[in-house]
Swiss-Prot record:
GO BP terms, alphabetized: response to stress
Name of the molecule in the record: HTH-type transcriptional regulator SarS
InterPro entries given in the database record: HTH_MarR-typ, MarR/SlyA-like, SarA/Rot_dom, Transc_reg_Sar_Rot_HTH, WH-like_DNA-bd_sf, WH_DNA-bd_sf
Recorded GO MF terms: DNA binding; DNA-binding transcription factor activity
Name of the encoding gene: sarS
């Protein structure tokens, strides 16, 4: 799939598809959420014994409320400790002892192994896929950051944006709903809801085939095609701008 030669968009969607497959495969097999693995990876590679909670929120693209919940779990299982500043009790810090750092290191090593084993089974040929937990963290934050960019600049969800990118890459800009579902790497209800939203906003046309009413066609007219191309070019430029690149670790 060419995505109309928008290389950064192609890379972005490849990464997101990889993350989707990874979560679907790994989530049932481990006793820790992916977010908790990522949080431990972040804390491990910071190599600091005390970190302000505000810095963690700033570096990671998760909602603050989500981070609070995951930190509670990690505190409960003695991976980290949470302390309040003696100067200002409103400021919270995450503290890590040497014993806890060793415990975290074991989990990060396990995460590295999980990623390598998944990559062997997945057999993706893309150069974008992460080789270890540190790269996984960076790519996860990269995709989350740009999902926010897309939502802010285009007022589209990531699924809606992906649908536009896929349809404009097809010959004659026509795709079967069945093929779109298989390509997009998102849940069926989520994809259909996004399609209906795009149709309602006038981005595309969704109709039954006149040759076979069991088939649903998704396509665009010339004006819709031009508008979608402009949006894709805008996002591709944002993705190519190094100033927008959100990496936790260089």
């Amino acid at each position: 799939m060419k995505y109309n030669n928008h290389d950064k968009i192609r890379d972005f969607i490849i990464i997101e598809a990889y993350m989707f497959r990874f979560k679907k495969k790994v989530k049932p097999e481990v006793d820790m959420t992916i977010k908790e693995f990522i949080l431990l990876t972040y804390l491990f590679h910071q190599q600091e014994n005390t970190l302000p909670f505000k810095k963690i929120v700033s570096d990671l693209c998760y909602k603050q409320s989500d981070l609070v919940q995951h930190i509670k779990v990690l505190v409960k299982h003695s991976y980290i400790s949470k302390v309040r500043s003696k100067i200002d009790e409103r400021n919270t810090y995450i503290s890590i002892s040497e014993e806890q750092r060793e415990k975290i290191a074991e989990r990060v090593t396990l995460f590295d192994q999980i990623i390598k084993q998944f990559n062997l089974a997945d057999q993706s040929e893309s150069q974008m896929i992460p080789k270890d937990s540190k790269e996984f963290l960076n790519l996860m934050m990269y995709t989350m950051y740009f999902k926010n960019i897309i939502k802010k600049h285009l007022t589209l969800s990531f699924v809606e944006f992906t649908i536009l990118a896929i349809i404009t890459s097809q010959n004659k800009n026509i795709v079967l709903l069945k093929d779109l579902i298989e390509t997009i790497h998102h849940k069926y209800p989520q994809t259909v809801r996004a399609l209906n939203n795009l149709k309602k906003q006038g981005y595309l046309i969704k109709e039954r085939s006149t040759e076979d009413e069991r088939k649903i066609l998704i396509h665009m007219n010339d004006a819709q095609q031009d508008h979608a191309e402009q949006l894709l070019a805008q996002v591709n430029q944002l993705l190519a701008d190094k100033n927008h690149l959100h990496l936790v670790f260089e």
